[in-house]
Amino acid sequence: MTCELCGRIQQGEWTLGDFFIFHQPQMLSICEACRQQFTRITGPVCAECGCQSQISPCAECEIWLTAGYPAIHNQALFAYDEQMQQYFKQYKFQGGYHLRDVFQDMLAQRLVKVAPTMIVPIPITTETQNQRGFNQVSAWLEKCEINEILTCISNSKAVQSMKTRRERLQTTQPFCLVTENLDLTGQRICIVDDVYTTGRTLRHASSCLYESGATQICTVTLAR
C-alpha cells in the first residue's frame, strides 16, 4: 500500500496470529514515518484555546473572556504546521475521504476521556457538502456516537481559509439548531472541529447550544 502523503510503499507489521488466520495487517492511509511528523501539542497550554503557552488564559483568549464570551476549554491534539497543512490539503480539498482513518482512533480516545453526554460536530454548508462530498469532522467521528444537531443557516459561505483574521472575527452567527426549540437542559456537550484558528466558529456554535439550555460545553479540535 502506498502512503498518500510521501508516496512510499508501506510494509505492514505481521504478527504470528496474522499468519495463522490468514489475516492481512491493517494499514492506515499514511505511513508511520509521516505519522511521526505530526507535532503533538504538549507541555503547558492555554486552558481556553489549547495552544502551547506559559500563560493561561493566553492574551488572545483573555480578550474573548473579557468581552463576556463563555469559556470553551478547547483541547487541541496537534500543531497546525506544514505537515498538518499538507494533510488537510489532500483530505479536505482534494477529495481525500479515505484519509479520515489517520486520526479516527486518536479523536475517539480523547472523547472517551472528555466523556460528554453529547458529541456535536461543526456542520458544513450544503454547498460544501455537494462540492466535497463529506463533512471532514463527522468522517473522523465514525467510531463515535455523534449528535448532528447544528446546521448552517446559509447554504453557502465564504471559505474560512480564504478569510483574513479580521474577517473571521467579524462573522455573524452561521449556525442554528436542526430542530427548533430543542431542549438541551442538563447536557454536557463537546463540540468537535478541525482547526482552532481564532475560535470564532467554536464560540458561535457554543452560544447557539447554550441558548438552548446546555449545561456545560467544551471543545476538541484536531489542530491549533
Each model region followed by its residue ranges:
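Glycine-rich phosphate/pyrophosphate-handling loop used in enzymes and phosphotransfer proteins
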Residues: 1-224
